[in-house]
């Protein structure tokens, strides 16, 4: 399992919310030799099926990353923007961004006085693409075009940092599972769209797939950095088995079976209670008449920033836990 190469490939693909096609094509190319069926639905979800005679298990990992959409272009060629997903404003200023067509720019803000706070509202931010006039800017970028933080994977040995690690890390787990899994159950792996703006892709896919069990793969925040308010999730101590978050109380039987799977596989895991945020697990739980659902999370520092950081051993542990669970 060369999880680093998988992570690098998926993290470098352009894919803000609503514009996940390039990510999907990268993933499709990686899994095509291990699937019985590959298809796309109307929302752009990539649905990869390995047929089996047992239960139908839906495994969901969202492809989309946070980003920005152009709302207007002023007379001096600066692009006004609106967030796609939950942008951490305090780490956005001065960052490089890229559009799907390759145009690059930098984000800054209206300087109304000398010095001052850098925690500014998004309405005061803009993207500078080097244009001097509105016409010059519109020749490169249109209103409605989306941008993301420019890709840049940092290999720190035992850890990797990158934009889009939320949730390309979860996608990498599903890719590695498909490459090596032995089960009689039917696995429907959904690489979902538009999670960052309301679990939209998973909601549609779950209704279509109609699973017996649902499992989401996603990252979860850590609080193991200096002076952070600590909670139970830290890097390097294994993936988490989620108990609940603000959108989902995980099915107790699914939680129990995940814990048992971790113990059988010899995988260290962490119990997770997340008081804010949600995952595709909530969309699966509420589809049709309801689905027993759970979540396996990968601890991640600096979520929703350009330097989302994971421990490689935690990602590998998530693969091993999930492989044992789906048996």
Q: Can you annotate each of these PLM segments?
A:
Residues 1-327:
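N-terminal hydrophobic/helix-forming segments and targeting peptides
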């Amino acid at each position: 399992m060369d999880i680093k190469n998988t992570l690098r490939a998926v993290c470098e693909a352009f894919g803000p919310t609503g514009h996940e096609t390039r990510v999907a094509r990268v993933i499709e190319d990686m899994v095509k030799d291990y699937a019985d069926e590959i298809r796309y639905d109307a929302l752009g979800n990539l649905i990869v099926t390995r047929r089996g005679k047992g239960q139908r298990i839906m495994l969901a990992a969202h492809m989309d990353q946070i980003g920005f959409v152009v709302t207007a272009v002023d007379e001096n060629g600066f692009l006004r923007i609106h967030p796609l997903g939950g942008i951490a404003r305090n780490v956005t200023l001065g960052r490089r961004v890229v559009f799907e067509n390759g145009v690059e720019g930098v984000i800054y803000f209206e300087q109304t006085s000398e010095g001052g706070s850098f925690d500014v509202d998004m309405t005061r931010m803009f993207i500078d693409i080097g244009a001097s006039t509105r016409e010059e800017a519109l020749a490169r970028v249109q209103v409605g075009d989306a941008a993301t933080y420019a890709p840049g994977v940092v290999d720190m040995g035992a850890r990797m940092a990158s934009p889009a690690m939320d949730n390309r890390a979860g996608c990498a787990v599903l890719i590695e599972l498909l490459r090596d899994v032995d089960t009689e159950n039917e696995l429907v792996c959904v690489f979902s769209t538009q999670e960052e703006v309301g679990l939209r892709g998973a909601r549609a896919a779950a209704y279509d797939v109609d699973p017996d069990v649902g499992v989401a793969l996603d990252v979860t925040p850590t609080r193991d950095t200096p002076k952070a308010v600590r909670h139970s999730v830290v890097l390097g101590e294994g993936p988490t088995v989620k108990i609940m978050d603000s959108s989902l109380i995980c099915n107790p039987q699914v939680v129990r079976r995940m814990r048992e799977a971790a113990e059988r596989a010899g995988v260290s895991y962490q119990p997770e209670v997340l008081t804010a945020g949600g995952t595709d697990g909530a969309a699966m739980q509420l589809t049709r008449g309801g689905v027993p659902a759970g979540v396996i999370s990968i601890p991640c520092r600096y979520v929703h920033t350009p330097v989302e950081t994971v421990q490689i051993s935690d990602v590998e542990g998530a693969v091993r836990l999930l492989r044992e669970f789906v048996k």
